[in-house]
């Protein structure tokens, strides 16, 4: 067992203890504001080096950003759907996970969210109006490949965001955001080359969305899940035909933007 000389607690251990308390505050208090280093020194009764080390620990975890220079201070970043999706995406990218693998995972998970929407007792008042509005918006972008893809993906994001189970919403929402980023990159590339699918195919996607909303409104969960899976497979095939063996890319600017657009929880 390692002993501490002169009975003093190592600075690293002090910093970890301070970091643990600040971490708990960030996670437990929604609008937590980090005190100044001077105040933290007083609150914890420790040295400035220990406080700075604690902040470095939290910064590596993505919970704070320490501002250097004359301004100083630190900004708090409370974890949410956006950060969950981004870090998951980086993990998949590091593991060299392909778009084909991500698509297969979504095939198993996303359609169940459509079924859960159909089981909500308040679906007629909460879910259906929002999904219908999203479809109506996408209709206005038929003929504009990039904008239509973005709007159509927003519909998928909404379906997941209305899933009552928080754990499923966070997990599946992260995968949906990652896929959306890849599909939007595909749309931009195909549009530049004049190869984006025809307006007829875009209109078919709109019809598929409307049929799905009809099943959700009627409370037919099994049929909603079946339709969602069939539609998802059809739209994924367009991307996988060219990019199926590419590795998920969460670090690209477009991917980060798509992930940041994840909708907040909708219960």
Regions inferred by a protein language model and the residue ranges of each:
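A ubiquitous short alpha-helical element
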Residues: 94-101, 118-122, 139-143, 192-201
């Amino acid at each position: 067992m390692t002993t501490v000389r002169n009975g003093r607690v190592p600075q690293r251990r002090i910093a970890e203890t301070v970091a643990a308390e600040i971490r708990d505050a960030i996670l437990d208090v929604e609008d937590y504001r980090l005190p100044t280093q001077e105040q933290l020194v007083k609150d914890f009764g420790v040295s400035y080096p220990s406080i700075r080390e604690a902040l470095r620990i939290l910064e590596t975890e993505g919970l704070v950003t320490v501002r250097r220079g004359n301004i100083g201070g630190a900004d708090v970043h409370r974890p949410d759907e956006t950060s969950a999706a981004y870090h998951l995406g980086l993990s998949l990218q590091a593991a060299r996970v392909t778009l084909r693998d991500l698509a297969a995972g979504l095939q198993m998970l996303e359609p169940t969210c459509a079924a859960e929407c159909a089981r909500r007792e308040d679906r007629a008042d909460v879910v259906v109006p929002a999904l219908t509005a999203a479809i109506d918006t996408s209709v206005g972008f038929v003929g504009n490949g990039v904008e239509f893809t973005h709007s159509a993906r927003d519909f998928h994001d909404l379906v997941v965001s209305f899933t009552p189970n928080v754990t499923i919403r966070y997990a599946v929402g992260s995968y949906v955001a990652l896929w959306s980023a890849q599909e939007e990159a595909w749309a931009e590339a195909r549009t530049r080359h004049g190869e984006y699918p025809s307006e007829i195919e875009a209109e078919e996607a709109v019809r598929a969305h409307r049929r799905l909303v009809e099943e959700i409104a009627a409370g037919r969960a099994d049929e909603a899940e079946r339709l969602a899976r069939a539609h998802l497979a059809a739209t994924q095939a367009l991307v996988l035909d060219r990019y199926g063996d590419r590795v998920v890319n969460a670090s690209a600017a477009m991917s980060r933007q798509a992930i940041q657009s994840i909708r907040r929880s909708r219960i």
